[in-house]
Amino acid sequence: MTLILGIDPGSRITGYGVVRDTGRGCVYVASGCIRTGAGELPDRLQIVYRGVREVIQTYGPVTMGIEKVFMARNADSALKLGQARGAAIVAGAEEGLEIAEYTATQVKQAVAGTGGANKEQVQMMVMHLLKLTTKPQIDASDALAIAICHAHTRSSLLPHGLGTARSRGGRLRL
């Protein structure tokens, strides 16, 4: 049984979700949001970095899935999102986690069965798959969806001898 961390990065709110992959599905462990509040970007990135490390040290996942940067209409927002991703990736790499990246479409496809699912549909499927009785915050729900996607991807690759190689920086390339 593998503990998996999912990260939905953001420069203001970073969602996290931890699931246990039992081989027959995922079991909910924890989820929440790292809120950076107002402040200068370097300070907010440090909060993301420290928050992700704290989650890793608290729950002990061995692998992490994180959402890839999407093309945003606002270049400044995309850059800030990329920097928040970087802070989370460095935190995971420093803790020795294997790290895989997924597009939003891949996550939606894995969890809801369609890459065009909206946030509410993904949230409802996360609740169903993890047998949750209350709705997680939307950023935490997205992070749980990323963790579920990572569990599904790992389980489909590992029997074929794939998904275990590590490249520079401990990042798992799929």
Swiss-Prot record:
Keywords for this protein: Cytoplasm, DNA damage, DNA recombination, DNA repair, DNA-binding, Endonuclease, Hydrolase, Magnesium, Metal-binding, Nuclease
Binding site for Mg(2+) 1: 8, 139
Cofactor entry: Mg(2+)
InterPro entries named among the record's database cross-references: RNaseH-like_sf, RNaseH_sf, X-over_junc_endoDNase_Mg_BS, X-over_junc_endoDNase_RuvC
Record's catalysed reaction(s): Endonucleolytic cleavage at a junction such as a reciprocal single-stranded crossover between two homologous DNA duplexes (Holliday junction)
Cellular location(s): Cytoplasm
EC number assigned by the record: 3.1.21.10
Active site per UniProt: 8, 67, 139
Gene Ontology annotations of biological process type: DNA recombination; DNA repair
Predominant place of localization: cytoplasm
Major enzyme class: hydrolase
Cofactor note text: Binds 2 Mg(2+) ion per subunit.
GO molecular function, one term: magnesium ion binding
Coiled coil spans: none
Residue numbers binding Mg(2+) 2: 67
GO cellular component: cytoplasm; Holliday junction resolvase complex
Subunit comment: Homodimer which binds Holliday junction (HJ) DNA. The HJ becomes 2-fold symmetrical on binding to RuvC with unstacked arms; it has a different conformation from HJ DNA in complex with RuvA. In the full resolvosome a probable DNA-RuvA(4)-RuvB(12)-RuvC(2) complex forms which resolves the HJ.
Annotated NCBIfam families: ruvC
PANTHER family: CROSSOVER JUNCTION ENDODEOXYRIBONUCLEASE RUVC
Function, as annotated: The RuvA-RuvB-RuvC complex processes Holliday junction (HJ) DNA during genetic recombination and DNA repair. Endonuclease that resolves HJ intermediates. Cleaves cruciform DNA by making single-stranded nicks across the HJ at symmetrical positions within the homologous arms, yielding a 5'-phosphate and a 3'-hydroxyl group; requires a central core of homology in the junction. The consensus cleavage sequence is 5'-(A/T)TT(C/G)-3'. Cleavage occurs on the 3'-side of the TT dinucleotide at the point of strand exchange.
Family per record: Belongs to the RuvC family.
Protein's name in the database: Crossover junction endodeoxyribonuclease RuvC
Species per Swiss-Prot/TrEMBL record: Pseudomonas fluorescens (strain ATCC BAA-477 / NRRL B-23932 / Pf-5)
Encoding gene, per UniProt annotation: ruvC
